[in-house]
Every structure is written in structure tokens, then in C-alpha cells.
């Protein structure tokens, strides 16, 4: 299968990548944090830049820039019985689309994939919408892809947020 970038990938690879991204959305919506964390490599990074033109997360202000250890720490905090900010009523729904494989390095089994997302969050009797672009760097490991880097570019990143994001988009 050839896309507009001229990259030739198999339909099986495209489907496998799509299924990974759809699965990620599902486990986030179901608040299955451990399953979500398992989608990342041990050195995986979740990054949400504070600016759309940001080239690096290191040494820059970010909304999120978390390695495996920090993601695990956030899970422990969110799941803690005294985490009142995460009380019942917090729900999300993710939609992922326009999944495109942008590059493939067959020697390192690494893919760069972009997609679009829309996430609706219901929390504190309020409905919030987030949308934007995901860029995933995926590594094939044990016959399955894992996330080495997930970059989340919010469409409205410069806009005001009425309360702090507690969980990942």
C-alpha cells in the first residue's frame, strides 16, 4: 500500500498500527492505566508541548513530558483513594482517525505515525473538548508495536484551561 508520501507499507502493518491506536483510546476511556502504560517501551515518553512549534520537550515548558517512571507515578496518584479530583463522574471518549504511517525504518523496526484525535471529557458537571494531532514513534518488539514516543499537539494549546489536566489525552 502506498500513501501520498510515497512510503510503501503493507496493509497488515497499517491495520496493526491502527489497532494499537484504537486500543490505546479504549484503555484510556476505560481508565485501565496499567494496560495503557504497558503500551509504552521502558524508555517511552509521553509529551504534550506547550507550544505548537516546539521541537524538543527537554529544557522547555511542557504540559506533559513524562517518562515511564513519571507516568507510573501519575497512575499511583490518580488511583489513590484520596485523589478526590478524580472522584466518580470523570469520563472520557476518544476518537482516533486519519492514521498515516509517515516513515518506516526496517532495520530498527521503527515507524513514525501521525493521526488526528478528538477527546471529550465529562468532569465536574462540565463537558470539555480536546482535539489535535498525535505523532507516535513505534518500535516493533516481540511481534507487537510499542510506543517509544507519543507527541500530543493540541489544537487549542494556547487557550485557557479552567482546571488542570489530571490524565493523558
Where in the sequence are the language-model features?
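A solvent-exposed, acidic/Ser-Thr-rich amphipathic alpha-helical stretch
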Residues: 42-104, 108-114
Amino acid at each position: 500500500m502506498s500513501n501520498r508520501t510515497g512510503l510503501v507499507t503493507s496493509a497488515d502493518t497499517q491495520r496493526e498500527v491502527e489497532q494499537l491506536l484504537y486500543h490505546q483510546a479504549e484503555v484510556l476511556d476505560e481508565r485501565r492505566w496499567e494496560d495503557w502504560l504497558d503500551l509504552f517501551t521502558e524508555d517511552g515518553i509521553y509529551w504534550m508541548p506547550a507550544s505548537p512549534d516546539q521541537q524538543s520537550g527537554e529544557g522547555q515548558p511542557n504540559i506533559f513530558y513524562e517518562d515511564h517512571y513519571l507516568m507510573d507515578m501519575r497512575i499511583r496518584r490518580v488511583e489513590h483513594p484520596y485523589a478526590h479530583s478524580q472522584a466518580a463522574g470523570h469520563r472520557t471518549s476518544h476518537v482516533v482517525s486519519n492514521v498515516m504511517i509517515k516513515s518506516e525504518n526496517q532495520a530498527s523496526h521503527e515507524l513514525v505515525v501521525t493521526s488526528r484525535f478528538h477527546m471529550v471529557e465529562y468532569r465536574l458537571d462540565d463537558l470539555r473538548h480536546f482535539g489535535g494531532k498525535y505523532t507516535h514513534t513505534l518500535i516493533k518488539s516481540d511481534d507487537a508495536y510499542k510506543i517509544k514516543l507519543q507527541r500530543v499537539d493540541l489544537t487549542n494549546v494556547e487557550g485557557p484551561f479552567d482546571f488542570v489536566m489530571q490524565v493523558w489525552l
